[in-house]
Amino acid sequence: MEIKEISTAALKEKIEADEELYLIDVREDEEVAEGMIPQAVHIRMGDIPEKMETLDKDKEYVFICRSGMRSMNVCKYLDEQGFKTVNVEGGMMAWEGETKPKN
């Protein structure tokens, strides 16, 4: 199954256009402490299996990590469970928009 991907530029456009977006950052606590996209929700990759029951299979979720590898693995896993997923190409390393420290 081919996983959909979005560039950081296209993601930034969606955020700036105030489009409805379900963005999940799957990095570790110490990584998001350095800054995350303000519109993102933080769910560590290791917590995804137990948290997936809180996700809605009718919604499309966009996943981001540091480089795009972990988020791709999360996308593949959730895709197999019947979720609609999109991976952010290049992850936070490619992101040039605003970030904020996680509270």
Curated annotation (Swiss-Prot):
Q: Which GO terms describe its molecular function?
A: transferase activity
* Superkingdom in the source lineage: Bacteria
Transferase found in the keyword field: yes
Could you tell me which PROSITE patterns the record lists for this protein?
Answer: RHODANESE_3
- SMART domains per the UniProt record, alphabetical: RHOD
Annotated InterPro entries: GlpE_sulfurtransferase, Rhodanese-like_dom, Rhodanese-like_dom_sf
SUPFAM superfamilies on file: Rhodanese/Cell cycle control phosphatase
Tell me which EC number(s) this protein carries. Answer: 2.8.1.-
Spell out the CDD domains in the cross-references.
RHOD
Which intervals hold domain Rhodanese?
17-100
Catalytic center residues: C65
Protein's UniProt name: Putative sulfurtransferase YtwF
Organism phylogeny: Bacteria, Bacillati, Bacillota, Bacilli, Bacillales
The gene coding this protein: ytwF
